Amino acid sequence: MDSVSKISRKINLFTKHIGTYSKINTSTTYYATVKLLVNNPCNIDQDTIFNLLEYSVIILDLDGFYQIIKHHNDIFRDNYRLIRYILYIAYQNHHQDCSVYYEMIKYLIDYGLDITFNDNFAIKLASLCHENILKLVIDNGGDVHADNEFPICLAANHGRLSCVKLLVDCGVDPFCFDNIVIKLASIDYYDNVVEYMVSIGADINAGNNYVLRYAIKNLDKKMIELAINAGASINDISPNDITHIIKYQSPTIMNILVEYGLDISTVNFCSKIRPERKKFVDNLISRGVDPTIIAYLSYACESD
């Protein structure tokens, strides 16, 4: 399995790509054109009909969707553009009522859509939508293990707890690939997903204590506390990690870690000291400059 950074890049590429489906212009003549289509279908060309379909998705016009779609002769045109577009809009509005999107997708499935099109694209995007849409896709053949467990990786990385739970219920191993799910959830502080993963047995120390050390790297106070309270080992914090906290001057983070038992004196063994700069500092000390003053100049000196 790829590293967390590679999976994160893969997720970013996927979500960046699906954003190209959103470029639909506002229509001021939508209802008039739909009425014309219903009364005189021969007067409306297929491209216009398809554009009306996409616009009906934007404005959640399910009745209009049903009226329009029966007049189009290729609803799976342009590499399944319509279903991809519905899923994209559902993803953008995942926190809202999904019933209209659900019915639109169900119509396409009942019409004959192969939900596994384009290497199971539908379940990948559905994992970012409301769990009811994800369940609809799964119930109609979507592969929960598609592309090396990519659906649960997407759901975890975007904090879709209900979708993570559904995928686990459907047989996905939540601890796959050295606990990649909990690692991805921790990146943007989706604490509910992290807490759920811990509750079902995920190893908070997996990947050389990835969750805690990534939180330290980002000076993420809440995730640091969550990870430690969930059992993350303080002993895995390296001198280089401590150096990072000192470099970015975060006394709050330092105090929290010390309270939990971190021995910050291990920073004396840091391996990231640059030889040329060490030589310069050693030269200052040999000429009588107090090492404490050097530290103050580095971290506490006022600007001119």
Swiss-Prot record:
Pfam families, per the entry: Ank_2 (PF12796)
InterPro entries, from UniProt?
Answer: Ankyrin_rpt, Ankyrin_rpt-contain_sf
The stretches annotated as ANK repeats are 82-117, 118-146, 147-176, 178-206, 207-236, 238-266
| Keywords, sorted A to Z | ANK repeat, Repeat
- Work out whether the entry's keyword set contains Repeat: yes
The protein's superkingdom reads Viruses
Question: Which protein are we looking at?
Answer: Putative ankyrin repeat protein R602
* Species annotation: Acanthamoeba polyphaga mimivirus (APMV)
